[in-house]
Amino acid sequence: MAKLHDYYKDEVVSKLMTEFNYNSVMQVPRVEKITLNMGVGEAIADKKLLDNAAADLTAISGQKPLITKARKSVAGFKIRQGYPIGCKVTLRGERMWEFLERLISIAVPRIRDFRGLSAKSFDGRGNYSMGVREQIIFPEIDYDKVDRVRGLDITITTTANSDEEGRALLAAFDFPFRK
């Protein structure tokens, strides 16, 4: 079992119960899922780029990504409905905890000119979204085999009812928020 999950069960739950005066352990917010999304707009011209992006996402997450297709045609972007334009992975359970551990301890500190993550990226319901400009911050990606530097979106979905609860949950995991 992931160390971060054990840490959550042993220490974070009790800390948040006292901080927010919950009556039940089930009221304590928890991480539900982590979604990784990589939009590959250039895939319209070259389908091979989407395969490379999917391979990168597989290496990062340890799970095969779902190819996302365009919902509607947009003439300005030269895309038609049903064109493959990206890929996404939804992590839950053990893989989610392992990814969160790697994200906090290894990947985020490797971001260039890193001064902390914005605490304003909560959506109002305790879910946190962040963008990563380069996929090479993850140790699973071999720098020499990268054909092009791509970014990805990471969304951490929690059961928190407010941004304050979500922020307290992620801060308890030593999430590096900007002061």
From Swiss-Prot:
GO terms for cellular component: ribonucleoprotein complex; ribosome. It comes from the Bacteria. GO terms for biological process: translation. Gene3D superfamilies: 3.30.1440.10. It holds the Pfam family Ribosomal_L5. SUPFAM superfamilies: RL5-like (SSF55282). PROSITE patterns: RIBOSOMAL_L5 (PS00358). Part of the 50S ribosomal subunit; part of the 5S rRNA/L5/L18/L25 subcomplex. Contacts the 5S rRNA and the P site tRNA. Forms a bridge to the 30S subunit in the 70S ribosome. Belongs to the universal ribosomal protein uL5 family. This is Large ribosomal subunit protein uL5.
